From Swiss-Prot:
Shows antibacterial activity against both Gram-positive and Gram-negative bacteria. Its antimicrobial activity is optimal at NaCl concentrations below 100 mM, suggesting that the antimicrobial actions of this peptide may take place intracellularly rather than extracellularly. Has no activity against the fungus C.albicans. Has modest hemolytic activity. It comes from Halocynthia aurantium. Its main location: secreted. The lineage of its organism: Eukaryota, Metazoa, Chordata, Tunicata, Ascidiacea. This is Dicynthaurin. One of its GO terms (biological process) is defense response to bacterium.
Amino acid sequence: ILQKAVLDCLKAAGSSLSKAAITAIYNKIT
């Protein structure tokens, strides 16, 4: 469920900068 939400955010963001930021946060959580 959480992973689907992250992918949804990545899709909504669309920008590589936001994608990198979300990826960094996601890696920090896991």
